[in-house]
């Protein structure tokens, strides 16, 4: 859309090496049918991540990194996204669990979807080998996907401690993650401490600080 095009034009002034394309999970809205009955409708934002990524890559010749989520996606829906990205020769991904739904107190997968990013990594690894979620196989002719994952210098809100976060980050790296991008942090010291802790734990991939420009105070 117009807003996204304007953002890309501004970003080009800084000669970015890549642009991350966020993904929004599907959400459910309830329509009042009267007589105490409600109809649940599943909605997903449009245009989708694949369309936005393809438009940016083709129009501006900038590498794009679409986000692939557990939240709001079944295994089959994830496979469709991977097939579309492969067809478009978009092979760099950021693999995330994603947020819980607005009405949830704890994270719940969509259908047969995944609880953890490491499970999503396994599906992508199998896809790179030509193995679909139903067990059927295809001949691999395209470049395989490479991907990064998330990490949390100030601890994930659901983690008991930073050691637990480091444990799972190491598992994600062992499963194939080539780098990690941090969640937003508000104390630079926490980032540098986390990088040193990761090295001490045997995590040797690049850890990139996640930075989000704020336009207004309420975004904090």
Show where each model-derived region lies.
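Alpha-helix-loop-beta-strand connector modules within alpha/beta enzyme cores
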Residues: 33-66, 112-149, 192-211
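Flexible, glycine-rich active-site loops centered on histidine and acidic residues
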Residues: 75-123
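Catalytic cores of alpha/beta
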Residues: 74-86, 164-167, 193-196, 216-219
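Active-site-proximal loop/turn and secondary-structure-junction residues that shape catalytic pockets
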Residues: 23-27, 70-72, 97-101, 151-155, ...
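Active-site/ligand-binding-proximal alpha/beta "capping" segment
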Residues: 136-174, 178
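Glycine-rich, proline-tolerant flexible connector loops at the mouths of alpha/beta enzymes
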Residues: 10-47, 101-111, 177-193
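Single conserved hydrophobic/aromatic residue that forms the stacking wall/gate
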Residues: 1, 5-9
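Hydrophobic faces of well-ordered beta-strands that scaffold small-molecule active sites
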Residues: 2-3, 17-21, 64-68, 93-95, ...
């Amino acid at each position: 859309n117009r807003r996204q095009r304007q953002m890309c034009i501004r970003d080009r002034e800084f000669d970015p090496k890549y642009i991350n394309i966020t993904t929004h999970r599907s959400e459910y809205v309830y329509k009042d049918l009267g007589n105490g009955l409600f109809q649940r409708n599943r909605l997903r934002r449009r245009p989708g991540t694949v369309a936005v990524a393809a438009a940016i890559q083709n129009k501006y010749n900038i590498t794009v990194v679409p986000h692939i989520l557990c939240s709001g996606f079944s295994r089959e829906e994830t496979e469709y996204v991977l097939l579309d990205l492969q067809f478009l020769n978009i092979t760099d991904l950021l693999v995330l669990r994603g947020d819980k739904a607005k009405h949830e107190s704890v994270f719940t997968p969509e259908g047969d979807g995944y609880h953890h990013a490491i499970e999503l990594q396994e599906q992508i690894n199998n896809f790179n080998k030509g193995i679909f979620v139903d067990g059927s196989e295809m001949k691999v002719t395209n470049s395989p996907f490479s991907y990064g994952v998330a990490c949390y210098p100030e601890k994930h809100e659901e983690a008991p401690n930073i050691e637990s976060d480091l444990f799972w980050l190491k598992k994600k790296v062992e499963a194939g993650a080539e780098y990690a991008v941090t969640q937003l942090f508000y104390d630079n010291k926490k980032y540098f401490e986390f990088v040193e802790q990761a090295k001490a734990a045997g995590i040797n991939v690049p850890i990139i600080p996640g930075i989000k420009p704020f336009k207004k105070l309420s975004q904090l």
